[in-house]
Amino acid sequence: MASITLDNLVKAYGDTEVLHHVAGQIEDGEFIVIVGPSGCGKSTLLRMVAGLETVTAGQISIGDRVVNQLEPADRDIAMVFQNYALYPHMSVRENMAYGLKIRKISKDEIARRVEEAADILELRPYLDRKPRQLSGGQRQRVAMGRAIVRNPQVFLFDEPLSNLDAKLRVQMRLEIRKLQQRLGVTSIYVTHDQVEAMTLGDRLMVLNGGYVEQFGTPIELYDRPATTFVAGFIGSPAMNFLPATAAEGSVTLANGARIAGSGTAHGTVTLGLRPEHLLPDEGGPVRVRVELVEQLGANSLLHGQLEGTDTEMVVSMPGHMSAAADAVMAFTPTADSLHLFDPETGKRIAE
């Protein structure tokens, strides 16, 4: 196991810079998730750590070694990809052992490592099967087993669950987390799925357009998002953003409604309200004209517009509820649930 240091990393293709001064310290045994939309640079960053992409500027250290110039095979890492990349003509046992054979590990040691990994991943009954005889989840376990047998210092996961259906994704992400906790190996995991990121990561690095928007625990990102991008990306449904004016410890919405708050912000702001932090209240200041209601079973999502404006809003309410189209419902934000952002920079306004 080892720590990883990303020191002011830059990646450019010709004159086009795609990663901009990425920095972060990943502690020994930590599970870090790099999350962001397609094209934000997350897989490029992972491939730089792996040695599959060159570093334009900056430095990557694994443990006490700077690895910029090291080949992937010399970095003591193991990768698990979206594509399982299993050899179809080999059994599960042979697929898991292949990398060790290339490294000329003894047969006894190979057998021991393969069987140990198979027990961890509950693959022992399938060791003599071919990949075509396995389900998608079992194939992904084989790919993880192939990484485990190498006893690396670092695991790198590049969207490993993207090819699985929704139910299997939930099952496999729990298995990956339990596996990492059991082995204690420093891990970096890339995904575009914020729910996957929140449930897996000790900390999340949110990328947007090649820049790090925020690097912190899931709860830090949820409770105190540093920017409107993070606020809108982390949490489901996404945060509501309302144009407003702050003064004297309160916030006034575009329709004149006033919300009591705290802090010293003054002037034009963007008010962020999470859909789950709005409580029904007949005299509440946030009045929403209903367009439709989504019944999800455990909760209901009310879609509409802030009364008197064209600002779209979503409210999440527990249990079952119904409301006629064009009805107006009033809500009050829960205590300490107001998020204020600078409308020009998108950055959080200090409270």
From Swiss-Prot:
<comment type="subunit">
    <text>The complex is composed of two ATP-binding proteins (UgpC), two transmembrane proteins (UgpA and UgpE) and a solute-binding protein (UgpB).</text>
</comment>
<dbReference type="InterPro" id="IPR047641">
    <property type="entry name" value="ABC_transpr_MalK/UgpC-like"/>
</dbReference>
<dbReference type="InterPro" id="IPR003439">
    <property type="entry name" value="ABC_transporter-like_ATP-bd"/>
</dbReference>
<keyword id="KW-0997">Cell inner membrane</keyword>
<dbReference type="InterPro" id="IPR017871">
    <property type="entry name" value="ABC_transporter-like_CS"/>
</dbReference>
<keyword id="KW-0762">Sugar transport</keyword>
<dbReference type="GO" id="GO:0008643">
    <property type="term" value="P:carbohydrate transport"/>
</dbReference>
<comment type="similarity">
    <text>Belongs to the ABC transporter superfamily. sn-glycerol-3-phosphate importer (TC 3.A.1.1.3) family.</text>
</comment>
<dbReference type="InterPro" id="IPR027417">
    <property type="entry name" value="P-loop_NTPase"/>
</dbReference>
<dbReference type="InterPro" id="IPR003593">
    <property type="entry name" value="AAA+_ATPase"/>
</dbReference>
<keyword id="KW-1278">Translocase</keyword>
<dbReference type="Pfam" id="PF17912">
    <property type="entry name" value="OB_MalK"/>
</dbReference>
<dbReference type="InterPro" id="IPR008995">
    <property type="entry name" value="Mo/tungstate-bd_C_term_dom"/>
</dbReference>
<dbReference type="GO" id="GO:0016887">
    <property type="term" value="F:ATP hydrolysis activity"/>
</dbReference>
<dbReference type="GO" id="GO:0005524">
    <property type="term" value="F:ATP binding"/>
</dbReference>
<keyword id="KW-0472">Membrane</keyword>
<dbReference type="InterPro" id="IPR012340">
    <property type="entry name" value="NA-bd_OB-fold"/>
</dbReference>
<dbReference type="GO" id="GO:0001407">
    <property type="term" value="P:glycerophosphodiester transmembrane transport"/>
</dbReference>
<dbReference type="GO" id="GO:0055052">
    <property type="term" value="C:ATP-binding cassette (ABC) transporter complex, substrate-binding subunit-containing"/>
</dbReference>
<feature type="binding site">
    <location>
        <begin position="36"/>
        <end position="43"/>
    </location>
    <ligand>
        <name>ATP</name>
    </ligand>
</feature>
<protein>
    <recommendedName>
        <fullName>sn-glycerol-3-phosphate import ATP-binding protein UgpC</fullName>
        <ecNumber>7.6.2.10</ecNumber>
    </recommendedName>
</protein>
<keyword id="KW-0813">Transport</keyword>
<dbReference type="GO" id="GO:0015430">
    <property type="term" value="F:ABC-type glycerol-3-phosphate transporter activity"/>
</dbReference>
<keyword id="KW-0067">ATP-binding</keyword>
<comment type="function">
    <text>Part of the ABC transporter complex UgpBAEC involved in sn-glycerol-3-phosphate (G3P) import. Responsible for energy coupling to the transport system.</text>
</comment>
<dbReference type="InterPro" id="IPR015855">
    <property type="entry name" value="ABC_transpr_MalK-like"/>
</dbReference>
<dbReference type="Pfam" id="PF00005">
    <property type="entry name" value="ABC_tran"/>
</dbReference>
<keyword id="KW-0547">Nucleotide-binding</keyword>
<dbReference type="InterPro" id="IPR040582">
    <property type="entry name" value="OB_MalK-like"/>
</dbReference>
<feature type="domain" description="ABC transporter">
    <location>
        <begin position="4"/>
        <end position="234"/>
    </location>
</feature>
<keyword id="KW-1003">Cell membrane</keyword>
